[in-house]
């Protein structure tokens, strides 16, 4: 019959440090008269694996054969010879724990458990520690034994130890430093270092008398002398894990016999610690990880306490202040606390840790509670205190009054230790890492040492219920001190004040519980579409209803309702505390109930804000109708990752509305929109009431906020906004804001598959607009929308200017009459801008877009699509609104093969250049009208000297460009863009961040964008360009710079006029004050005023006022601009001219000569020369006439030389052959 697993009858065992074998195991069991010291040593030897069976007091029990059923020892240990490789089985040890002896590992065979719960907590702790045993042969014991044999005070080196023990020096060093870290060895300085036994260890071993170097037990008179010291010291069981059990057994024996410990306190003394040995105990000194000494909850509590006092700290500083040494010791704890929402970090290298607001509030409340004076608690019996420590059942003993006495306990009962005549309070014991408790039945039996019997399978009834340690009953059953009825309760007002600091819902529920009242949240109404619902909630406390609240989510609605209820309750509680009379409080209650009733049946003005729409949608629609831009600004983000808080506010222009906080961005935006709408509603109410309107009129006007907002002028804002957005979206917004329906219809489709043609037509409010033809459906819709927009907005603008109440269809004749009226009759111009609150730059942009839209609203579809607009506005005085005198669009340059030797092509069709050429034509027309009789109505006046004319001091010219000029003025990203602001300061702050900024740049031929000029001298030639050399045209930023030095008039008009400079420059998009001012004026004064001092009178360096539009913010539009270019000046009346920018001629099959070409402008110069009797200039060529203006020519050469000297590059001009054409004398 094979022996059952886990049992052996042979029991042979070879010790690694002993030359002989134990051929026979000693099964001497202590009888009733045996010494307790002998039993203690047997118990220790059994725990170390040196005995196969557990010793029992009081009865001799022979080793049981495996065939006997029923009774089994608690820890059947099978020890076999290591050379034979037999298995060692310890009952109760889980799988995965291995024995290690002489380098050979033997896995445990886990027996099938028979479910049995432990009878008491102390034994469960003992078994759980026993399950953590790891039996192995350690080099540490060999080294310690060798050093002990050397004698006290003697030391040796690692090299000698390696030779004596036959172990590699590397392994010896590792063990030596490990022992030194545990405090068992002492390292002496030297090379190589000397090692010896630590003084504290020797003193303890000699004083305690447990084990001497010779191997005899000092305090065991009945110890087994056959066991040599090597049998006991060179054990294969880990000392670190056995130490708690040795301490328990030693405690039991010392309590029984009164043996004095090294700390000079008797075990039975009042100051003794039954659960822990002195500080040199191996159970604590052997733990290398600092976290092993401390409970995780204790570490977290220390971290929270420290952060509560210092507000923030790094991980290293935290570790040092709570008793650790390195940051890595608490990094894992901090990360775990961050997940729980107790702390959060800022920064990365290294992070700074803070307490979260919620954790700080909880700690503050806890501290405030603890600070309340408590009644003296009842004295805790010593039995409860002692039950917190690990104990073993020991025999009863009647000793002196200061001895420990225990009652007889049965199997499965809790041992209760009675302490008699104890007057001194015992200090709080050091805390060990809590043992691991396994849920479920234990795999080890329980031994009744007093009765000397093995435990049976019978489970007592008292073990069938969950039991806690005696020390835990008080914490669970007794009511906390702050709920004690003996303590004075805080007032309702103070409680409400504390609850107000929390989440509104949590605070209200806490107050209701405090006041022993029921609190309910009732949903009254749900409205709105499924994608944007609206919820209305109401708080009911003990049947009392509070004002409801409405929001876009249930959570927010509950929070708002709770906040309203908290506000009302707080006011009532405050009134009671302030000592108001009952009548006043009753009156306030009635008043509040009336408000509640009113809130339950809200007026239409209160509900019309968000009827069927979300607050964000309603606010955006209202802002669209007002022509203002609306922005949701994220002010801050707080809180941990699992519970963030976002703070948002709404900004409309320069006005900012109150900010709100919410747990999500969507909810925060909705709440911010609600606040903005309420503020707007309040402003509208106040403004209407201030106009002395009847009360019925006010309520009727407030029935719908949207019906009030269109009363403000919005058409100008729509004009600027719609013309700078996607045409389809702009038309749909326009139609929706006016209550119309808009649609696009495919009228016709033709052409081959590789080149189809689609004819689209837009319909708005039942009215069809002109059809357009395109090569794709998308382009067709965009162009149809653009055409419809221009017709609609043009009609509205004309009606507004002329004071019409209704919009009438615009025909060619009416347009012609309107344009003539606007251009010739100053009385027809409005004196003030209809756009309330707009800035100066908004006025300039509005005039430019209005004029362009009026000219092109019924023009051909070739003008549709993305374009760049530039215009020059003239103001006759500071109060004059201004009039557009020239405008142009375009973004192309002529191709090299389209150059003309006769001046018949326009080389640069960019919007800024075209508007300036139109401005020159305007100046020619004004000069032709000038005479001494009509000088009062002219914009000119005689200059000093009388030979030339100059612009009157009150007349100013302003340039508007819908985007930044190409070249140096547009070389920045959008993050550098400046916001629009109305500033009276005209000082420039140019940006010079790197040497590349300020360089001259040329435009790309037949494309968009610019490239820098080369550093070498470049002289373009006619034949080179014709043969394929790249045609270079200076960028718009560089040309505007030249206008601010030499003037807008050019070389030819310098014969008759003084230089004319711009007063301001306004941009609609991509504006940066530092980059723009550097590009258009300030780069020539980078090194001071030396350049300006070299200019001859009347030329100066002009620094115009710069700014951007604020009533809209254009979005970036993808796709290339069209090749067409439009030019117009005030002298042309209603006549628009459309050019092909790549050819420089009029768009059409005949390639007609443009009116802004060199040839036509030179023709106007010839007419002016005849009119002013300058016959000397009539016979000159175009180039010669320009050079004849010597002052201008000198200033131009100086300007080009200055740019080169400053390192900006060479100015590149067109070939000279292009300027050598003549005209017949006029």
From Swiss-Prot:
It is an enzyme of class 3 (hydrolase). Residues 716-725 are annotated as: N-terminal extension of DRBM 3 and constituent of a bi-partite nuclear localization signal. The keyword Hydrolase applies. The modification Asymmetric dimethylarginine is found at residue 26. Changing residue 716 to N: Disrupts the bi-partite nuclear localization signal and abolishes nuclear location. GO terms for cellular component: cytoplasm; cytosol; membrane; mitochondrion; nucleolus; nucleoplasm; nucleus; supraspliceosomal complex. Residues 886-1221 form the A to I editase domain. It catalyses: adenosine in double-stranded RNA + H2O + H(+) = inosine in double-stranded RNA + NH4(+). Residues 503-571, 614-682, 726-794 form the DRBM domain. The modification Phosphothreonine is found at residues 601, 603, 808. Changing residue 806 to V: In a breast cancer sample; somatic mutation. PANTHER family: DOUBLE-STRANDED RNA-SPECIFIC ADENOSINE DEAMINASE, EUKARYOTE SPECIFIC DSRNA BINDING PROTEIN. Catalyzes the hydrolytic deamination of adenosine to inosine in double-stranded RNA (dsRNA) referred to as A-to-I RNA editing. Residues 208-238, 258-286, 574-610 are annotated as: Disordered. Zn(2+) binds at residues 910, 966, 1036. This is Double-stranded RNA-specific adenosine deaminase.
């Amino acid at each position: 019959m094979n022996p059952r697993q886990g049992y052996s009858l042979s029991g042979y065992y070879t010790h690694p440090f002993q030359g002989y074998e134990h051929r026979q195991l000693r099964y001497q069991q202590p009888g009733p008269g045996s010494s307790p010291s002998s039993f203690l040593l047997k118990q220790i030897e059994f725990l170390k694996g040196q005995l196969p069976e557990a010793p029992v007091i009081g009865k001799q029990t022979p080793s049981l054969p495996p065939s006997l059923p029923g009774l089994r020892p608690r820890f059947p240990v099978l020890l076999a010879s290591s050379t034979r490789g037999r298995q060692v089985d310890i009952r109760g040890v889980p799988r995965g724990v291995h024995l290690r002896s002489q380098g050979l590992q033997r896995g445990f065979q886990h027996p099938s458990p028979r479910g049995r719960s432990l009878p008491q907590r102390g034994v469960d702790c003992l078994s759980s520690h026993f399950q953590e045993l790891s039996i192995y042969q350690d080099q540490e014991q060999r080294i310690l034994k060798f050093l002990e044999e050397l004698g006290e005070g003697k030391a040796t080196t690692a090299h000698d130890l390696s030779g004596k023990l036959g172990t590699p020096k590397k392994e010896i060093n590792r063990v030596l430093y490990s022992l030194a870290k545990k405090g068992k060895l002492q390292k002496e300085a030297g090379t190589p270092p000397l090692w010896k036994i630590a003084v504290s260890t020797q003193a303890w071993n000699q004083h305690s008398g447990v084990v001497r170097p010779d191997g005899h037990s000092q305090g065991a008179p009945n110890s087994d002398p056959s066991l040599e010291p090597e049998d006991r010291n060179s054990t294969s069981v880990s000392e670190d894990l056995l130490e708690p059990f040795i301490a328990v057994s030693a405690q039991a024996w010392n309590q029984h016999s009164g043996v004095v410990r090294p700390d000079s306190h008797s075990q039975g003394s009042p100051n003794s610690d039954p659960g822990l040995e002195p500080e040199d105990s191996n159970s604590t000194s052997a733990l290398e990880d600092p976290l092993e000494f401390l409970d995780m909850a204790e570490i977290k509590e220390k971290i929270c306490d420290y952060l509560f006092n210092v507000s923030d700290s790094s991980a290293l500083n935290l570790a040092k202040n709570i008793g650790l040494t390195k940051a890595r010791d608490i990094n894992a704890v901090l990360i775990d606390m961050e997940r729980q929402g107790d702390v959060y970090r800022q920064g990365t290298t290294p992070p700074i840790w803070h307490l979260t607001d919620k954790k700080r509030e909880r700690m503050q409340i806890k501290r405030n509670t603890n600070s309340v004076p408590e009644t003296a608690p009842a004295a805790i019996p010593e039995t409860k205190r002692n039950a917190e420590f690990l104990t073993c059942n020991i025999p009863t003993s009647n000793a002196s009054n200061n001895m420990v006495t225990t009652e007889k306990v049965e199997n499965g009962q809790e041992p209760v230790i009675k302490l008699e005549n104890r007057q001194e309070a015992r200090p709080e014991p050091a805390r060990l890492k809590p043992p691991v408790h396994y849920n479920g039945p234990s795999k080890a039996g329980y031994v009744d040492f007093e009765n000397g019997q093995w435990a049976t399978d019978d489970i007592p009834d008292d073990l069938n219920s969950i039991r806690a340690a005696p020390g835990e009953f008080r914490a669970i059953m007794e009511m906390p001190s702050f709920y004690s009825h003996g303590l004075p309760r805080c007032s309702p007002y103070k409680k409400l004040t504390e609850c107000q600091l929390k989440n509104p819902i949590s605070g209200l529920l806490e107050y209701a519980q405090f006041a022993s009242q029921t609190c309910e949240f009732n949903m009254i109404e749900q409205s709105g579409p499924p994608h944007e619902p609206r919820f209305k909630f109401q708080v009911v406390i003990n049947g009392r209803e509070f004002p409801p609240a409405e929001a876009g989510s249930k959570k927010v609605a509950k929070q708002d309702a709770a906040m309203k209820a908290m506000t009302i309750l707080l006011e009532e509680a405050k009134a009671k505390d302030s000592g108001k009379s009952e009548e006043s409080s009753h009156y306030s209650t009635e008043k509040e109930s009336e408000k509640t009733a009113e809130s339950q049946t809200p007026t239409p003005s209160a509900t019309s804000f968000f009827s069927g729409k979300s607050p964000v949608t309603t606010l955006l629609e209202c802002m669209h109708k007002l022509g203002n831009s609306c922005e949701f600004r994220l002010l801050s983000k707080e809180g941990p990752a699992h519970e963030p808080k976002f703070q948002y506010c709404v900004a409309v222009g320069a006005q900012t509305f109150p900010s709100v906080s919410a747990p999500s961005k969507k909810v925060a935006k909705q709440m911010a929109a609600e606040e903005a709408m309420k503020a707007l509603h309040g402003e509208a109410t106040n403004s209407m009431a201030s106009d002395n309107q009847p009360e019925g009129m006010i309520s009727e006007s407030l029935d719908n906020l949207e019906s009030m907002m269109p009363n403000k002028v919005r058409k100008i804002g729509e004009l600027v906004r719609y013309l700078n957005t996607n045409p389809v979206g702009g038309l749909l917004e326009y139609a929706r804001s006016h209550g119309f329906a808009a649609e696009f219809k495919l009228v016709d489709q033709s052409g081959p598959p590789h080149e189809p043609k689609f004819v689209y037509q837009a319909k708005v409010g039942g009215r069809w607009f002109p059809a357009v033809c395109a090569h794709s459906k998308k382009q067709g819709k965009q162009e149809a929308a653009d055409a419809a927009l221009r017709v609609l907005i043009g009609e509205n603008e004309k009606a507004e200017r002329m004071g019409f109440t209704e919009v009438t269809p615009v025909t060619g004749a009416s347009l012609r009459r309107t344009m003539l009226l606007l251009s010739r009759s100053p009385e027809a111009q409005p004196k003030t801008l209809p756009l309330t609150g707009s800035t100066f730059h908004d006025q300039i942009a509005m005039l430019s877009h209005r004029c362009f839209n009026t000219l092109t609203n019924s023009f051909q579809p070739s003008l549709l699509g993305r374009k760049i607009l530039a215009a020059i506005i003239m103001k006759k005085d500071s109060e004059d609104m201004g009039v557009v005198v020239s405008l142009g669009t375009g973004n192309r340059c002529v191709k090299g093969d389209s150059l003309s030797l006769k001046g018949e092509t326009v080389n640069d069709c960019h919007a800024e250049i075209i508007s300036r050429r139109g401005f020159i034509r305007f100046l020619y027309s004004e000069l032709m009208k000038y005479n001494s009789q009509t000088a009062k109505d002219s914009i000119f006046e005689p200059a000093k000297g009388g030979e030339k004319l100059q612009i009157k001091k009150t007349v100013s010219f302003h340039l508007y460009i819908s985007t930044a000029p190409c070249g140096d003025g547009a070389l920045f990203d959008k993050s550098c863009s400046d916001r629009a602001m109305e500033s009276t300061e005209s000082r420039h702050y140019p940006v010079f961040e790197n040497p590349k900024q300020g360089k001259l740049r040329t435009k790309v031929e037949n494309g968009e964008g610019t490239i820098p000029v080369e550093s070498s001298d470049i002289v373009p030639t006619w034949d080179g360009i014709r043969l394929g050399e790249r045609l270079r045209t200076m960028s718009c930023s560089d040309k505007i710079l030249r206008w601010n030095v030499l003037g807008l008039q050019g070389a030819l008009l310098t014969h008759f006029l003084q230089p004319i400079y711009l007063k301001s420059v306004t941009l609609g998009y991509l504006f940066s004050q530092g980059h723009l001012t550097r590009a258009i004026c300030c780069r020539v004064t980078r090194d001071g005023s030396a350049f300006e001092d070299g200019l001859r009178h009347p030329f100066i360096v002009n620094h115009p006022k710069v700014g951007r539009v604020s009533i809209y913010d254009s979005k970036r539009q993808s796709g290339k601009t069209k090749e067409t270019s439009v030019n117009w000046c005030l002298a042309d009346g209603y006549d628009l001219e459309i050019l092909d920018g790549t050819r420089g001629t009029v768009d059409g099959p005949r390639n007609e000569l443009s009116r802004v070409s060199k040839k036509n402008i030179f023709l106007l110069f010839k007419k002016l020369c005849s009119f002013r009797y300058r016959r000397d200039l009539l016979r000159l060529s175009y180039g010669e006439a320009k050079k004849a203006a010597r002052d201008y020519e000198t200033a131009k050469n100086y300007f080009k030389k200055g740019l080169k000297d400053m390192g900006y590059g060479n100015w590149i001009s067109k070939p000279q052959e292009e300027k050598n054409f003549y005209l017949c004398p006029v």
